Amino acid sequence: MRPKVVFVLGGPGAGKGTQCARIVEKYGYTHLSAGELLRDERKNPDSQYGELIEKYIKDGKIVPVEITISLLRREMDQTMAANAQKNKFLIDGFPRNQDNLQGWNKTMDGKADVSFVLFFDCNNEICIERCLERGKSSGRSDDNRESLEKRIQTYLQSTKPIIDLYEEMGKVKKIDASKSVDEVFDEVVKIFDKEG
């Protein structure tokens, strides 16, 4: 069985992680966060990629696509090997640019099906406020204003065009993410009840 994938996109602080946790609970998807996989890999002393990832993340740059895809693929393979029924994945924070998308299409063509793109649309200032709030407790080195402004720039320049591309293919489900967590999830539920 091929994995069924929903790409989850939106700026930093749009609430992707929070909503993904709820989707997992309600619909039995497996949540893969590209950023989390990279951060875990960076901490793994045996990783061949650790130092390289560290450098990219520190500079607020996007990690080379081969690394991200190999981590995503490894997780999907392991999940499905453990339980063949678990073939539905939310991939959060990927693809982040043209290079990511081309890498995915080249590597995963015929190996995974992208059902749709869940796009959490949120204004930048709200996103920044949320991240700064989160930074107080998350200990994430990139939850500071300077790093955030860089991340939002990167997102606008690189990820937004990807969303537009999927939009043309009729694959984008857009949600106003500036509302409360519950209101946003109500919208999410409408989409997943229809799309599965």
UniProtKB/Swiss-Prot annotation:
It comes from Sus scrofa. One of its GO terms (molecular function) is UMP kinase activity. SUPFAM superfamilies: P-loop containing nucleoside triphosphate hydrolases (SSF52540). Residues 33-63 are annotated as: NMP. Monomer. GO terms for biological process: 'de novo' pyrimidine nucleobase biosynthetic process; CDP biosynthetic process; UDP biosynthetic process. Transmembrane segments: none annotated. This is UMP-CMP kinase. The modification Phosphoserine is found at S33, S180. The modification N6-acetyllysine is found at K43, K55. ATP binds at G13, A14, G15, K16, G17, T18, R134, K179. CDD domains: ADK. It is an enzyme of class 2 (transferase).
